[in-house]
Structure formats: C-alpha cells, structure tokens
C-alpha cells in the first residue's frame, strides 16, 4: 500500500461532488460479491419453506428484483458509471442459523474500466427490500441488515476479500 494520503475520489479539491474520470483506466475483467440478510419471523421461514407467502413466490421475485436493480445502479446512485454488466447472480437462502432470516448473496461481473461493487450492493439491497415487501403481510417487523461487499476482483487496486 502506498504512503500517499488517501482521499475521497468522488469529491474535487473544492469539496464538490464529481464523477471520477475513468477514461485512462484499463478495461479489465472485474467481479464483486455482496451479501445481506433479512431477519424474519419463524412463521415466515415456515411459509417460505412450505406453501409460500400471500403475495406469491417471494424468493423468485426478490431474485429478479435484485438482478434488475444491479442494471439500474447508475440511475439510482448519482456518481456511479454506466457499465456493461456481463452477468448477475442473486441467491437467496432461507435459514435459521443464527436466527430466522433470508440470506442474500449477489455477484456481478463486467469487463470495463471500473468495478461493480455498487452494483452488487444494489442487487442485495433491492432483493432484501423485495423480501420485506413480499412478507410484510405476515411479518411487519422484518429487518434488513448486514449489507456489505464480501469480495472484489480486478482493477488497479487488485483483489480484496472481507477478512
């Protein structure tokens, strides 16, 4: 790691927000994986594992919502670059460990000049919000939590994994 001082890249010298110029960066293969959870009641876990919730296929709808959201990231987050996304996978798992929840994991891939961490985070966030929407008739207390980047590969800064 360099000894040079670190700074926020989306802020110019005067403190104004700016979109980073990536035109001089190399086009490389890049991936990012993010995760998150929706804490739900035991009743919701039972419904998701069995007959389903009143609104329908909660996990299927959340998966598609996450994929769609990844593609909309630059529309939702002002300083994100529009990218050519090569692939998005969103996986949801109903679990009791360590507590009743829906675990969400999204991986986004591109070959471009900047990374896809924000796209992966957006996919997880919107998938989680969709789970809440799908189960709220049964569990108004559902909680979205623990959204974070797990890994990223490619680019000038190289690979990174959450310790």
UniProtKB/Swiss-Prot annotation:
Top-rank taxon, per record: Bacteria
GO biological process: Mo-molybdopterin cofactor biosynthetic process
Location of the active site: 133
One GO MF term attached to the UniProt entry: cyclic pyranopterin monophosphate synthase activity
Metabolic or biological pathway: Cofactor biosynthesis; molybdopterin biosynthesis
Catalytic reactions on record: (8S)-3',8-cyclo-7,8-dihydroguanosine 5'-triphosphate = cyclic pyranopterin phosphate + diphosphate
EC number from the UniProt entry: 4.6.1.17
Alphabetized UniProt keyword annotations: Lyase, Molybdenum cofactor biosynthesis
Family annotation (InterPro entries): MoaC, MoaC_bact/euk, MoaC_sf, MoCo_biosynth_MoaA/MoaC, Mopterin_CF_biosynth-C_dom
Keyword field contains Lyase: yes
Binding locations of substrate: 79-81, 118-119
Family annotation (HAMAP family): MoaC_B
UniProt similarity note: Belongs to the MoaC family.
Subunit structure: Homohexamer; trimer of dimers.
Function field: Catalyzes the conversion of (8S)-3',8-cyclo-7,8-dihydroguanosine 5'-triphosphate to cyclic pyranopterin monophosphate (cPMP).
Name of the protein: Cyclic pyranopterin monophosphate synthase
Species this protein is from: Nocardioides sp. (strain ATCC BAA-499 / JS614)
Lineage: Bacteria, Bacillati, Actinomycetota, Actinomycetes, Propionibacteriales
């Amino acid at each position: 790691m360099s000894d040079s001082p670190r700074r926020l890249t989306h802020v110019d010298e005067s403190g104004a927000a700016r979109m980073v110029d990536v035109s001089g960066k190399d086009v490389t293969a890049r991936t990012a994986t993010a995760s998150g959870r929706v804490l739900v009641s035991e009743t919701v876990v039972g419904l998701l594992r069995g007959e389903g919730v009143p609104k329908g296929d909660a996990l299927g709808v959340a998966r598609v919502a996450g994929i769609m959201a990844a593609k909309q990231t630059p529309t939702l987050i002002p300083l994100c670059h529009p990218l050519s996304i090569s692939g998005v996978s969103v996986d949801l798992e109903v679990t009791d460990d360590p507590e009743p929840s829906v675990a969400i994991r999204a991986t986004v891939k591109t070959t471009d000049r900047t990374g896809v961490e924000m796209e992966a985070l957006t996919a997880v966030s919107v998938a989680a919000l969709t789970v809440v929407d799908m189960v709220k008739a049964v569990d108004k207390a559902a909680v979205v939590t623990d959204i974070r980047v797990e890994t990223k590969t490619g680019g000038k800064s190289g690979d990174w994994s959450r310790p």
